[in-house]
Amino acid sequence: MARIGSFLILLSLTYALTLCICDNASNFGGNKRNLFPDFYRSSCPRAEEIVRSVVAKAFERETRMAASLMRLHFHDCFVQGCDGSLLLDTSGSIVTEKNSNPNSRSARGFEVVDEIKAALENECPNTVSCADALTLAARDSSVLTGGPSWTVPLGRRDSATASRAKPNKDLPEPDNLFDTIFLRFSNEGLNLTDLVALSGSHTIGFSRCTSFRQRLYNQSGSGSPDTTLEKSYAAILRQRCPRSGGDQNLSELDINSAGRFDNSYFKNLIENMGLLNSDQVLFSSNEQSRELVKKYAEDQEEFFEQFAESMIKMGKISPLTGSSGEIRKKCRKINNS
């Protein structure tokens, strides 16, 4: 309990020192103007405190959970907006997004979201959306791992729909080329700077062998390994990821500091030690993104500032606000189902 208490004290101090980072960039769809940090000031004043507490306890149990929660937020926002659709299980007319290719056997942390929602419902029934809870959990996950904090605009509502097909076409894949990744970010109203900064979240977490095997043995269907991959790093990866079998074997996205949110990810790209093809192409395939990688590798503070701004911007993708959507009582199912 003492360690959990120290996490919460650290988080509280961090938020007290955090400047409000505002983002006026345009996102496609939704009414993001109805999102503002004090949305729950009267209706649920302890909402952020409750989310912080549950996330801190989950992080205490398993530090990997921070990366998992951040990934859930990203995968939610890129598919019909930040509306909690990813959290829905299959039920009635709902076909879950959890079984789509980008999420199947890799998206995790749903139990923690359930814990957060239960605590919020106990404090303020029918008030705080699952979409907002997940957005706050992503911010808290950054702070717990040593990353930046930011003021989260709130007021999202939850969707009553989900799409198993949309994640397959809207989310970037680990083996995508640069142009495909950039297009998918652009489709969500995010620019090149957002792409590079948000990719920096891969400074924490892990990826499955099945997501990077092609770089070791069959890059772009050539039957040969990716010759740009740093040789000693490639040898380490081959020990963890055989040519066949071991699909679920894990490797750190940032081999130098997998549990600490820092700018090591960008330094790795410069050394040709990006785990995923979708990581390494940020340095190898586009001059503008290469310069951003270099800048963030040299200046962690600048990376942190841009990451916070880009997370705010991503969190404003096509939100449901006002009377649209609903406030789910349980994040896994729509109300009255």
From Swiss-Prot:
**PROSITE patterns named in the record:** PEROXIDASE_1, PEROXIDASE_2, PEROXIDASE_4
Keyword check for Heme, yes or no. Answer: yes
Query: Per UniProt, where does substrate bind?
Result: 172
Q: Name one Pfam family in it.
A: peroxidase
Q: Where is the signal peptide?
A: 1-22
Chain positions carrying an annotated carbohydrate: 24, 191, 218, 249
- An example Gene Ontology cellular component term from the record? extracellular region
Put simply, this protein is called Peroxidase 14
Extra information: There are 73 peroxidase genes in A.thaliana.
The job of this chain, per UniProt, is described as: Removal of H(2)O(2), oxidation of toxic reductants, biosynthesis and degradation of lignin, suberization, auxin catabolism, response to environmental stresses such as wounding, pathogen attack and oxidative stress. These functions might be dependent on each isozyme/isoform in each plant tissue.
- Name a biological process GO annotation: response to oxidative stress
Instruction: Cite the binding residues for heme b.
Output: 202
Q: Which family does it belong to?
A: Belongs to the peroxidase family. Classical plant (class III) peroxidase subfamily.
InterPro entries for this protein: Haem_peroxidase, Haem_peroxidase_sf, Peroxidase_pln, Peroxidases_AS, Peroxidases_heam-ligand_BS, Secretory_peroxidase
Reported EC number(s) for this entry are: 1.11.1.7
Q: Which of this chain's residues are annotated to bind Ca(2+) 1? A: 76, 79, 81, 83, 85
Its gene is PER14
Q: Which SUPFAM superfamilies match?
A: Heme-dependent peroxidases
Catalytic residues, chain numbering: 75 (proton acceptor)
Spell out the molecular function terms from Gene Ontology.
heme binding; lactoperoxidase activity; metal ion binding
Please tell me the species this chain comes from: Arabidopsis thaliana
